[in-house]
Amino acid sequence: MTAQSNITPESIVGDLRYLQLLSRSFPTIADASTEIINLEAILNLPKGTEHFLTDIHGEYEAFQHVLKNASGAVKRKVNEIFGNTLREAEKKELCTLIYYPEEKIQLVKAREKDLDDWYLITLNQLVKVCQNVSSKYTRSKVRKSLPAEFSYIIQELLHETSVEPNKHAYINVIISTIISTKRADDFIIAMCNLIQRLTIDSLHIVGDIYDRGPGAHIIMDTLCNYHNFDIQWGNHDILWMGAASGNDSCIANVIRMSMRYGNLGTLEDGYGINLLPLATFAMDTYADDPCTIFMPKMNFADTNYNEKTLRLITQMHKAITIIQFKLEAEIIDRRPEFGMSNRKLLEKIDFERGVFVYEGKEYALRDTNFPTVDPADPYRLTDEERELVEKIHYSFMNSEKLKKHMRCLFTYGGMYLVSNSNLLYHASVPLNEDGSFKHVKIRGKEYWGRKLLDKADQLIRTAYFDEEGEDDKEFAMDYIWYMWCGPEAPLFDKDKMATFERYFLEDKEIQKEKKGYYYTLRNREDICDQILDEFGALGPHSHIINGHVPVKTIQGEQPMKANGKLFVIDGGFSKAYQPETGIAGYTLVYHSHGMQLVQHEPFQSRQKAIEEGLDIKSTNFVLEFNSQRMMVKDTDKGKELVTQIQDLKKLLVAYRIGLIKEKV
């Protein structure tokens, strides 16, 4: 008995208004039947390949390369298709062309004597690769991915076989005509971009696009134009969202971070933030101060600065750091419920003796020059500092590019995501020592587990979108800063952020940040199951996917925790963490055959990738192998399609029994 025969007239009467609306899209029995056939066919295709990346931290070249080579999938497919029929050097050339078509074509033109012959060979090779990567999709989906100007021609090439002599001649004529009409360059570029697009069906960024590295704005440009992606906000992303919302403490933090790593590109080139007022203030205020402890970490910088510029960045770094401490104290005083009064540390300095006094113990200060700090009122901004804060605030609030990128972060992002039974969030779900969910009080009401992350998500959106001057907006603006460094914030979940201690004190013990219980308890399978149940991520193949804490692979730490229930995939995209991790990042890949982790070696440079064919060396580890290939019907999208099919079957019954008339 079919599902349709179970649909009775009585069962569809309640849905009649909806079915009448549906009939506008499918006005006849033939239309509805055709759509049912199409959707049933889609359900039985293999699921698309999902890629999970986290903690990119502005490393745009490595990030873009991983997207272009699909974490090694393109190279693997080229090897599968051409095997021993191409030499290794030829396969490497083809892969480089697929990754960087515009640049590679120019190099080929400079060296190739018979360009038309190269075009002919290359176009045939690209057609084979394209046929392979498009084979798991419907023709309709592939068609929607095609560039308009070449849509018809690419469809002809993809869906015709060259085995039959007539078809072989037909394909050759198409390719020859592309070459003779001088369209080969554009066509090759279109084919390469299509291969890149079809190899990754969906992309999940599990937080921390921003800070440390040089090109977060370039990563955001790439994402804003990407075909299918989502973002789970990280603590560094939240900091920039707070800055874009107008929180001056967040603004000071993002500037300080840029100075610390010597990467000003995102601020100045990306968002047009005017740092001249800060430079002028810093030069005047710290003219005779060596500011030694504020020297940027130049081994991670995007530019080789001359001595004069380096000196200026060092002064600016100190200036904005002191301003940050003052601005944060204003929030701490305004929000005693945050319980962060112990982070007001300027008042604990004995300025006369140059020591820091904390809990009865004295610590020598590494820097004792505080020209803008009044010992009697250490958190009061000087008139010059207040004016500077206003100027920088104006610059952040009027950056159109920043607004565009923040809208993208809000539209495609959130605190967490449940996708195909996987639960994605950047850092933590706060827990008590016994493993129960920690109850966190926000404005007098307690939240925990999923409700806590939902509330945080709502407050972050309120901070950015709500009307100025509203009480809810003011609280949300302060809370977005708390999300960055608050002890009970799910994106931080440590007892303190020891920024002051790391700058000013030598003692390593006082610099330690004690992690919340989540970070140890997540190694237990029962705890992970409890969290998965809380968020409705059900099924035998459900997992938690985290970033935030770098996996110290070099020390033997494994990214897989809790008997395979949880994956931590921060492998060190950020160059600052590569000495700790020993590698340069992970990609988690979830395809129809199962899950695998791709471990990346450091990326040399885009230039070397183009000129020398240097790919990222990646190692694959199978984490989970499906005994039966996973189909679209097994995914979240499949569940949606099943519901659509059921509705269309109801519409068919409504047509056939006369409840709705066909519109022939």
Curated annotation (Swiss-Prot):
Quick one: which pathway? Carbohydrate biosynthesis; gluconeogenesis
Q: What is its EC number?
A: 3.1.3.11
Q: Which cofactor does it need?
A: Mn(2+)
Top-rank EC class of the record's enzyme: hydrolase
Query: Could you tell me the keywords of this UniProt record?
Result: Carbohydrate metabolism, Hydrolase, Manganese
Query: Which GO biological process entries does UniProt record here?
Result: gluconeogenesis
| Record's protein name | Fructose-1,6-bisphosphatase class 3
The organism is Bacteroides thetaiotaomicron (strain ATCC 29148 / DSM 2079 / JCM 5827 / CCUG 10774 / NCTC 10582 / VPI-5482 / E50)
Taxonomic classification: Bacteria, Pseudomonadati, Bacteroidota, Bacteroidia, Bacteroidales
